[in-house]
Design a protein with these regions (language model features):
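Generic hydrophobic-segment detector
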Residues: 27, 40-43, 91-92, 349-350, ...
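Conserved beta-strand/loop scaffold segments within soluble protein domains that form the structured core
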Residues: 111-112, 116-400, 414, 418-442
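N-terminal amphipathic, basic helical "cap/leader" segment at the start of enzyme domains
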Residues: 2-151, 176, 320, 325
Length: 442
């Protein structure tokens, strides 16, 4: 597949932005937006250790200009075996998109869903085919001028996923986007935009992967989730990148009245991950469930910042993030619950738990509250623990090998996450990858 992939553009510049936009035949409004993002990129500094949000994550070795941007293109092809394994059985999906090195090789959507108004395609294609549905929403949830990474993404994103669900349509099966990346020195910048109209329901699963010893690469992604009144979105982001990859991203949802978003973030791969996951509950009665799981080994570094923003009365958020760390892996969790003055009757819960398997591993956890309302319930907490040797001894006394005993304890630790995932394909993939991560643990 690599031979047929579009060439990666190099040397970040305003001319590159104009060239990529022109080659894609984009409308003037999008070209102008990209150029404005480029100006912000030039103006904004790269985050440093002086920034509190970046103090525990060292990116001093990162050179954004060293990665060539992968443009989006479409070319029919067969999925590489690792991507097929990552996606699993497509029969259980209502729709499927497969992307290799920026090239969309497959797009599948049942005719009955298309006839009922569901749109599931790349965002680049949607700009041309459905501008009336893209333009009002693109960039309204994630702004290009928030920091240098957002600006980098806003100027140069390509491909990504556009999912539009018309009013009242409920889709029972998940839609799946599978992405494989193995291009040396590539920058992959997908943008996902999900718009669910009133009283609709949909599930989007995005899986990403590259070979364990794969090429050096950069991923900078953004996800905008927009559920209208009474709509429900379930979003899963599962990555198994190779260790030579940097990943930066943001997943942000803005919820209207009585809307619901369930998000699940899973990180198994990459050398360094820095991701923001945020829910802004702006409509009365809206609900956000935020789940996260990270399993680090070697020298992997995972940094998650979460925000539960309650801006309306009678809203509910529930966050549970868990990390398992071995070898010299490190995790950073910074979570904020914010309840504005008008957010009375708020219910907000935030919990981060970490399990350390090796002496050299480390977890930093910083849960926070900002409360302006006075009639609400907010709880937050964090814990970091190590394996209980007494419990391991007890299991081994029942003729279980130590490796099996430890795996049972890890499974028990993660069961709180697994039990809240209704998607069998996701639970199965998580279980398989956790088992692989534990193979060399003694």
């Amino acid at each position: 597949m690599s031979d047929s992939s579009a060439a990666a553009a190099t040397t970040l510049s305003r001319a590159l932005v104009e060239e990529m936009s022109g080659a894609a035949g984009e409308p003037a409004w999008l070209r102008d937006r990209r150029l404005a993002a480029w100006e912000a990129f030039v103006r904004l500094p790269l985050p440093s250790a002086d920034d509190e949000a970046w103090r525990r994550t060292d990116i001093s070795a990162l050179d954004l200009d060293a990665f060539g941007v992968l443009p989006h293109s479409v070319q029919k092809g067969r999925a590489p075996a690792p991507l097929a394994a990552l996606v699993g059985d497509p029969a259980g999906a209502a729709g499927l998109r497969l992307v290799v090195n920026g090239v969309q090789i497959e797009e599948r959507l049942p005719r009955d869903l298309a006839q009922r108004g569901l749109i599931f395609t790349s965002l680049s294609q949607a700009v041309a085919a459905h501008p009336d549905l893209v333009r009002p929403y693109l960039g309204t949830v994630v702004r290009d001028d928030e920091n240098k990474f957002r600006a980098h993404h806003g100027a140069l994103w390509s491909g990504g996923t556009f999912l539009y669900v018309p009013k009242g349509l409920e889709v029972d099966l998940q839609l799946v986007t599978g992405t494989w990346l193995d291009r040396e020195g590539a920058a992959f910048l997908p943008h996902t935009l999900v718009v669910a109209e009133e009283r609709s329901r949909v599930t989007l699963v995005e899986v990403f992967g590259s070979a364990e010893g794969s090429a050096r690469a950069l991923v900078n992604h953004a996800v905008e989730l927009i559920p209208k009144a009474g709509a429900q979105i379930r979003y899963v982001n599962l990555q198994e990148w190779g260790r030579q990859l940097w990943e930066f991203g943001i997943v942000r949802a803005v919820l209207e009245r009585d809307a619901t978003v369930h998000s699940l973030m899973v990180a198994f791969g990459a050398g360094l991950v820095k991701t923001n996951v945020e829910s802004s509950l702006r409509g009365q009665g809206s609900t956000s469930e935020m789940l996260g799981l990270a399993f680090g080994d070697g020298t992997q570094h995972f940094d998650y910042h979460t925000l539960q923003e309650h801006a309306a009365p009678s809203t509910t958020s529930d966050l549970l993030y868990k990390g398992v760390l071995k070898d010299k892996a490190r995790s950073v969790f910074s979570g904020l619950i914010r309840a504005d003055y008008g957010a009375q009757k708020t219910n907000a819960f935030q919990l981060n738990r970490n399990l350390i398997l090796s002496e050299g591993a480390r977890a930093d956890s910083m849960p926070k509250l900002e409360i302006m309302a006075n009639d609400l319930r907010c709880t937050h907490g964090a814990s970091t623990s190590r394996l209980n040797e007494d419990q391991i001894f007890y299991l081994m006394s029942r003729a279980l090998p130590r490796a099996v005993a430890v795996r049972m304890m890890v499974d028990g630790f993660l069961s709180e996450i697994f039990d809240r995932i209704p998607l069998e394909m996701v639970r199965r993939r998580l279980s398989e990858t956790v088992e692989r991560k534990m193979e060399d643990y003694v």
